[in-house]
Amino acid sequence: MSSRTTLGLSAPDLSGLDGSGLKVAVVAAQWHGTVMTGLLDGALRGLVDSGVHDPAVIRVPGSFELPVACASLADHFDALVALGVIIRGGTPHFDYVCDAATRGITDVAVRTKTPIGFGILTCDDEAQALDRAGLEGSHEDKGYEAAQAAIATLTALSTALASGPS
């Protein structure tokens, strides 16, 4: 792992994954550009560290649009990584977008049986988001973690399904 890749407190160590030969797409929102740059860079590092070559990158306007993009792509990729940033403001909008994005991503993953690494930050302020973005000085790299989670889930499911019922 690079020196900028810092796992969150109690995060599993998923190093050593073999994602070679997998077709993976990263679906990334555009709101909060600095944070998104860190998340996207971290996700791409996480995929490369897992042996995934040439992941596709699809940009959508915001986190609300992530579920429909993932739903459209799920049948064409082995795994997806969804990245976004939602920062609390003074209205209920934060709650609505967080709920819609989370439920939407969950629904797509369950319905299509496609692992989706969940890299949507839901933060009270920009400082919290920057601290999790995998940037220089950040304490965590949630983009990296989301990418590794997608590959680890796909690997676990593939292994379980290959071994058949016991």
Curated annotation (Swiss-Prot):
InterPro entries: LS (IPR034964), LS/RS (IPR002180), LS/RS_sf (IPR036467). GO terms for molecular function: 6,7-dimethyl-8-ribityllumazine synthase activity. It catalyses: (2S)-2-hydroxy-3-oxobutyl phosphate + 5-amino-6-(D-ribitylamino)uracil = 6,7-dimethyl-8-(1-D-ribityl)lumazine + phosphate + 2 H2O + H(+). The active site is at residue 93. Keywords: Riboflavin biosynthesis, Transferase. One of its GO terms (biological process) is riboflavin biosynthetic process. It comes from the Bacteria. Signal peptide: none annotated. Belongs to the DMRL synthase family. This is 6,7-dimethyl-8-ribityllumazine synthase. The lineage of its organism: Bacteria, Bacillati, Actinomycetota, Actinomycetes, Propionibacteriales.
